[in-house]
Amino acid sequence: MKKAYWIAKYKKINSQEALTKYAEKAKKIIESFGGKALVRGGKYITFEGDDFIRTVIWEFENINVATECHESKDYQEAWSLAKNTTKRDLMIIEGI
């Protein structure tokens, strides 16, 4: 199977504290599904399209595992810590 990439592009963060709490819990959950962090913030340049304030990319063994992680009760509970104070685009993309 092809690897999959979980890409989160953050548009708005109203509470850094809430996002930090989410990130601490989510990191452990995602890693328990075999997720490997490739990008967690850092410098960036936007050449085209909408600008984002933060981008996070995780690599998974395949799209099924990435989806299972996202839909898990534990991950959804972690996301509930930040979802009311954070606006983001989130997608899972299969690699080549």
Question: What residues fall within each predicted segment?
Answer:
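C-terminal structural segments of small proteins and small subunits
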Residues: A66-M91
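Short S/T/G/P-rich N-terminal loop/turn motif that feeds into the first structured element of a domain
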Residues: M1-R54, E61-T67, E71, E94-I96
